[in-house]
């Protein structure tokens, strides 16, 4: 599943890719936002478990350990997602397609602890995540290949640095 934002021109930006059973929307619930400015797109048939925000954020009158653990988990989840948001911001704040692409690929290599890795996007998805034009992204990948900086095939990359 992907969290996607559409601008007024219909341009798509992938905010995040989600794994099965990964929660989403908790920041909007905690902030009291009624209508989230994102859409969730499922690539395959999915079932969504809807939890009411009020029940999540306000523990029962017994102040049981379950609710304390639940609140702790929500805070931890928000903190982790904040870190991921800042990692994406670090990428999208770059000025050029090349800078954005290399910043993203370096992050992936570091995360995988390897210069060889598979990303969760096809070319259009990667362009949407980086907030760049797909044809410009493909041209930049081609240049980086010719310069010997990387090898790639579909969503597989190998960095040579």
Give the positions of each predicted feature.
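A generic structural motif
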Residues: 4-8, 41-43
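Glycine- and acidic-residue-biased ligand/ion/polar-headgroup-sensing regions
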Residues: 1-6, 20-22
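Cyclic-nucleotide recognition modules
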Residues: 14-72
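Residues that act as N-cap/strand-start positions at coil-to-secondary-structure junctions
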Residues: 9, 34-35, 144
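Inter-domain helical "communication" segments and dimerization helices
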Residues: 59-72, 76, 80-93
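Short alpha-helical segments that sit at the start of domains
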Residues: 84-108
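Phosphate-/nucleic-acid-contacting segments
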Residues: 97, 104-161
């Amino acid at each position: 599943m992907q969290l996607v934002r559409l601008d007024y021109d219909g341009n798509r930006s992938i905010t995040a890719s989600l794994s099965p059973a990964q929660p989403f929307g908790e920041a909007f619930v905690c902030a009291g936002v009624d209508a989230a400015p994102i859409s969730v797109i499922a690539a395959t048939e999915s079932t969504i478990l809807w939890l009411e925000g009020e029940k999540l954020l306000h523990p029962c009158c017994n102040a049981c350990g379950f609710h304390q653990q639940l609140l702790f988990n929500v805070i931890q989840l928000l903190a982790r997602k904040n870190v991921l948001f800042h990692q994406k911001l670090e990428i999208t704040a770059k000025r050029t397609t090349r800078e954005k692409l290399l910043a993203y690929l370096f992050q992936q290599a570091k995360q995988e602890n390897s210069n060889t890795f598979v990303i969760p996007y096809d070319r259009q998805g990667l362009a949407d995540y980086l907030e760049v034009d797909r044809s410009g992204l493909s041209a930049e990948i081609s240049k980086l290949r010719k310069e010997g900086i990387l090898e790639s095939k579909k969503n597989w990359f190998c960095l040579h640095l």
